A protein has these predicted regions:
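Outer membrane beta-barrel
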Residues: 1-5, 15-189, 251-288, 293-308
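Surface-exposed beta-strand-turn/loop segments characteristic
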Residues: 9-13
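Outer-membrane beta-barrel pore domains
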Residues: 16-17, 175, 183, 190-350
Length: 350
């Protein structure tokens, strides 16, 4: 459910948003996880959705069935695995965490615009240094996915890697510092186009590039997190450099800073195998005559696409800042209610 208010300058840039006020059923998701019981069990994952809206420059919007994950995880060594199939690329904590597990209803604009949703490929991942470090790398080409060109060579190929480190962990493990970074290269055979909504789903694109063909592109990503008891601070920076003489090698970048405080005192656990944070463990659910878990959050995000050609004549792709506040009520680990407020500024006609 959205309630939207805008000024005249906003109407001039993106049109009247009254039609985007209201509610929608975003999607019905379903799937399963199981094992093939060898000496070292293989894990299979299948998840999909109907009427699903999956954001990102290489994701597909469809009213039909959308396959999110079709993955097989094969253990190689004790703390190293090999994954094959349609899966998340190993880059960015915000992208690797499930959307519903974060403090905000939507990811930051830069994450959806410059980082992919899912892709078809292979990934090798493992943990090191007493589970204080993770390394993951993969190669991807989505020629087997729906609505893609028919041959492997006609599709863009990506090489993606991520490394994380926990340089500090307190004796009682309540305080933890996480740092990480990732790289993503693509040969851009399918061209480049991207867009970003103002961090609410039922909205038009506020930022949008034109479609063009760079020689290739490189994305750099960095992240840092501090968790101290119920407090969690997280930030990420993402930058994409496009090799395009026609448009003077444009750079697109942005960052976000997020703060979360769990009012009921739960501590968000850390998944050392992947280098991400897990969902809030509800200490006492409403089914146990408790109050569930309550969380407040705040985020600032910024996205700059102004060096890229815009999708509208006479405009560049735009710059956007978003200030957000959120309140989450987890009744159980599987059910929550939340409300978000956004204040958005946009410049597309600099």
């Amino acid at each position: 459910q959205n309630w939207v208010d805008q000024d005249r300058q906003s109407e001039f840039q993106v049109g009247d948003l009254d039609e985007f006020s209201g509610g929608e059923v975003r999607g019905l998701r379903f799937g399963g996880v199981g094992t093939l019981n060898f000496d070292k069990p293989w894990v299979w994952t299948i998840f999909g959705a109907t009427h699903a809206f999956d954001e990102g420059f290489d994701a597909v919007e469809s009213d039909e069935y959308t396959l999110f994950d079709l993955r097989l995880d094969i253990p190689i060594w004790e703390k190293t695995s090999f994954s094959i199939g349609k899966q998340k690329e190993p880059i960015s904590m915000e992208r690797l965490m499930a959307l519903g597990h974060g403090p905000m209803q939507e990811r930051a604009a830069v994450s959806d615009a410059l980082l992919p949703s899912r892709n078809v490929g292979v990934v090798m991942a493992g943990t090191f240094a007493d589970d204080r470090m993770t390394l993951a790398g993969g190669a991807f080409n989505n020629w087997l996915d729906k609505d893609q060109p028919n041959s492997f060579d006609d599709n863009a190929t990506q090489y993606v890697g991520r490394a994380t480190w926990v340089p500090y962990l307190s004796n009682n493990e309540s305080t933890l510092l996480h740092v990480g970074g990732g790289l993503r290269y693509t040969n851009s055979k399918e061209g480049f186009v991207t867009q970003a909504r103002p961090e609410f789903n039922q909205a038009p694109d506020f930022l949008a590039t034109d479609f063009f063909f760079p020689e290739d592109s490189m994305t750099y990503q960095g992240e840092a997190s501090l968790r101290s008891g119920p407090l969690w601070l997280h930030g990420e920076y993402v930058r994409t450099d496009l090799d395009s003489r026609e448009f003077s090698d444009p750079t697109l970048d942005g960052y976000h800073i997020t703060a979360s405080w769990i009012l009921t005192g739960e501590v968000r656990p850390y998944n050392e195998r992947v280098g991400i944070f897990r969902p809030i463990p509800v200490a006492r659910t409403v089914t146990q005559n408790g109050w569930g878990a309550w969380e407040v959050g705040a985020r600032y995000s910024t996205m700059d696409m102004s060096e890229a050609p815009g999708s509208t004549i006479g405009a560049d792709a735009g710059e956007m800042d978003v200030w957000s506040l959120g309140l989450n009520w987890w009744l159980t680990p599987y059910m929550n209610f939340n409300v978000n407020y956004r204040y958005i500024t946009l410049d597309r006609f600099a």
